[in-house]
Amino acid sequence: MTNQQKVILFQGDSITDGGRGRNSDPSHILGHSYAFLIASKLGYRYAEQQPIFINRGISGNRVSDLYARWNEDAISLKPHLLSILIGVNDAWRMMDRLPQGATDRFERAYRHLLSETKEVLPDTKLVLLEPFILKAGATEQNWSEWRERLDT
């Protein structure tokens, strides 16, 4: 890595994972999600700077899973820019009628993860993406309940 190269890290759940490869195959290393699309655009636009794009999204992760692997899969990579999209699986768990307070635990864990990151990597820029649910498949049947619970 040269002095000019910037590390751009994508973190999150399956939406970030996008079926990424777990080896060095350049055709699949970033997956086929928004991380790939953004890396393609920025890689082209800033080709002379040779940015390094890393995708560490893991399908099925909740914020607690992300926090458990944070040192290895985020802090140690020392990203210049860190994009996080997490929370869809947490929302699913809330809809499964898990114990009260799940929303509070999600918020506390996420805030702790972010504050720890800013403490250890104060110059890292953060891009936080809001988790979302689409009205399709499993959510379509109970869409009004999803909307009501997620909007509160």
Where are these regions (language model features)?
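Short glycine-rich His-centered loop
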Residues: 2-28
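Alpha-helical cap/lid subdomain in secreted, periplasmic
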Residues: 2-3, 37-52, 65-152
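A structural signal for the hydrophobic beta-strands that form the central parallel beta-sheet
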Residues: 10-11, 55, 128
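Glycine-rich beta-strand-to-loop/alpha-helix junction loops that act as flexible
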Residues: 11-14, 59, 86-88
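Short, flexible/disordered intra-domain loops and linkers
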Residues: 22-30, 139-144
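Short catalytic helix/loop segments, enriched in acidic residues and glycine
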Residues: 24-44
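Pocket-edge positions in alpha/beta enzyme catalytic cores
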Residues: 26-30, 58, 98, 102
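Short beta->alpha junction loops
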Residues: 54-62
